[in-house]
């Protein structure tokens, strides 16, 4: 038996969905159940191995849709600038280093290569852009070998992506993706798939699912139909990660489902089980399905996280210390918290605020800190394991107006902040 967990993407600032998957992965490992975590998105900025390891997954746990049809393994990047230099067929006349970007110039050919490093100061290259006569013509993406290449042509003075080519370990071509804006055609040696939906359907059909396997759908946007149609004879489960309906739109005769679950709920007769995080949500869903639909779904409760033990500070908590931990995303409103602490500083000069997490709002928070000259008492701490960190603080702040489950708040409840 294998449990396949279907998701879209994963990032450095992952959501509760990925944390729930990571918790589930730990449970599967502890109980000896074979599980795979499938990611359907294209990853261009980072190596999936790095992102997954950051969440606690092992490389062998991961299946990436786009590499499944190659013989490449999920693995960290080991390709270096020196490796790149050996492969460039021209004389390198100049080198420039600017942060995470190393540029190698070939003056005679009017070509330069921009190597994007995994981390500043390292020699590990994630991708390389080739620019000829001022025009981007190619991007190569690496792990322990070249994974795939993007090809570009200039259109209206902009680089236009028209093709991706995916490689095997020996450099042979596994398949091509022909790109036309948001549409793609996938070309294999023995078949052509005319959309990503067909690509996903083909992938599902190649898993060799049996009646002993389970497919758990964590996110369904753009994938739901293909997964639903190609899961049998395996069992299909759907995870409800958030509030599943709009309370303000409920009447005696109608209900407005959360759009992320509408397809799954409308096809509930094809779902073997739904998973909620709490018994309360399970009870509400059962009542609503009974009232508004002809379906009688099987719904089980599996929490998306747990706390293994009570943790108390070994000494005194840091005086006037404040902590928050979340994705640095707009809906978390960490900027409100930073501004509130700046205001509190006026009457409480000893206050100290540590912000844990990463995300799109990081630059905005840095600007707030700098504008208020708050560098001495507001600190961005990045993504860290906070298991033994929470207990040292006196106060936890949250600016989020809604939570699907609130893993952080669960952790805090046993630390007595």
What would you call each of these model-derived segments?
Residues 401:
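Aromatic "clamp/platform" in nucleotide-sugar-dependent glycosyltransferases that forms part
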Residues 364-383:
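Nucleotide-activated donor-binding/catalytic signature segment of Leloir-type glycosyltransferases, i.e.
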Residues 261, 268-297:
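A short, active-site helix/loop in glycosyltransferases that binds the activated sugar's phosphate group
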Residues 320, 324-343, 360-366:
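A conserved mid-protein helix/loop that constitutes part of the nucleotide-sugar donor-binding site
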Residues 383-384, 388-393, 398:
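Short alpha-helical donor nucleotide-sugar binding micro-motif in glycosyltransferases
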Residues 203-209, 243, 252-274:
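Membrane-proximal helix-turn-helix segments that form the acceptor-binding/catalytic region
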Residues 415-417:
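Conserved small/polar residues in nucleotide/adenosyl-binding loops
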Residues 406-409:
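Short glycine/serine-rich donor-binding loops of glycosyltransferases
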């Amino acid at each position: 038996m294998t449990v396949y967990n279907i998701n879209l993407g994963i990032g450095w600032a992952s959501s509760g969905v990925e944390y729930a998957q990571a918790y589930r992965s730990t449970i599967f490992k502890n109980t000896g159940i074979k599980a795979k975590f499938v990611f359907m998105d294209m990853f261009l900025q980072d190596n999936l191995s790095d992102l997954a390891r950051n969440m606690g997954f092992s490389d062998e746990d991961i299946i990436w849709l786009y590499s499944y049809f190659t013989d490449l393994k999920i693995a960290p990047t080991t390709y270096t600038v020196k490796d790149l230099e050996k492969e460039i067929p021209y004389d390198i006349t100049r080198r420039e280093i600017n942060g995470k970007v190393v540029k190698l110039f070939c003056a005679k050919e009017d070509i330069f290569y921009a190597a994007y490093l995994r981390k500043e100061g390292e020699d590990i290259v994630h991708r390389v852009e080739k620019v000829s006569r001022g025009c981007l013509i190619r991007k190569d993406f690496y792990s322990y070998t070249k994974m795939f290449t993007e090809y570009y042509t200039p259109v209206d003075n902009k680089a236009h992506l028209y093709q991706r080519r995916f490689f095997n370990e020996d450099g042979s071509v596994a398949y091509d993706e022909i790109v036309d804006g948001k549409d793609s055609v996938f070309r294999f040696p023995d078949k052509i798939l005319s959309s990503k939906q067909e690509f996903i359907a083909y992938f599902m059909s190649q898993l060799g699912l049996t009646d002993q396997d389970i497919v758990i759908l964590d996110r369904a946007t753009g994938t739901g139909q293909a997964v639903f149609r190609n899961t049998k004879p395996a069992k299909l489960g759907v995870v409800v990660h958030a509030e599943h309906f709009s309370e303000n739109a409920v009447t005696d005769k109608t209900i407005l489902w959360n759009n992320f679950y509408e397809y799954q709920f409308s096809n509930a007769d094809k779902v073997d089980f739904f998973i909620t995080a709490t018994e309360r949500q399970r009870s509400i869903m059962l009542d609503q399905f009974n009232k508004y639909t002809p379906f009688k779904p099987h719904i089980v409760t599996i929490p998306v996280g747990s706390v293994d033990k009570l943790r108390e500070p070994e000494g005194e908590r840091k005086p006037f210390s404040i902590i928050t931990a979340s994705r640095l995303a707009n809906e978390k409103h960490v900027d409100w918290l930073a501004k509130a602490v700046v205001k509190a500083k006026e009457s409480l000069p000893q206050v100290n605020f540590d912000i844990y997490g990463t995300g799109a709002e990081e630059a905005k928070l840095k600007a707030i800190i700098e504008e208020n000259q708050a560098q001495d008492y507001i600190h961005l701490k990045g993504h860290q394991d906070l298991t033994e960190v929470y207990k040292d603080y006196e106060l936890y702040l949250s600016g989020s107006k809604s939570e699907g489950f609130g893993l952080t708040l669960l952790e805090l409840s046993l630390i007595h902040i």
